[in-house]
């Protein structure tokens, strides 16, 4: 697997490499091959994964048809460490004081 390093920017190249590896499923493969998996365990795991995929597919289909409510979209700006001052946000839940 090759990644182009532009302007000696190794951090960006590493990020691109990790993204490629993630897409290819290399990390998942490494995790699975980290220890021996008995054939019966492998069969059970693959069956569970297939059931999970089928359930997810059925849920998506029902959502598209309008029979199930859609998953709420995340509100941007209130992520980790962000400003979450809403109802019941604790003492002094008003606007943030200026610095």
From Swiss-Prot:
A single GO cellular-component term on record: ribonucleoprotein complex
Residue ranges of the region described as Disordered: 60-99
Keywords: Ribonucleoprotein, Ribosomal protein
GO molecular function annotations of the record: structural constituent of ribosome
Pfam families named among the record's database cross-references: Ribosomal_S21 (PF01165)
GO biological process: translation
PANTHER family: MITOCHONDRIAL 28S RIBOSOMAL PROTEIN S21, SMALL RIBOSOMAL SUBUNIT PROTEIN BS21M
Family listed: Belongs to the bacterial ribosomal protein bS21 family.
NCBIfam families: S21p
Designated name of the protein: Small ribosomal subunit protein bS21
The organism's taxonomic lineage, starting at the top: Bacteria, Pseudomonadati, Pseudomonadota, Alphaproteobacteria, Hyphomicrobiales
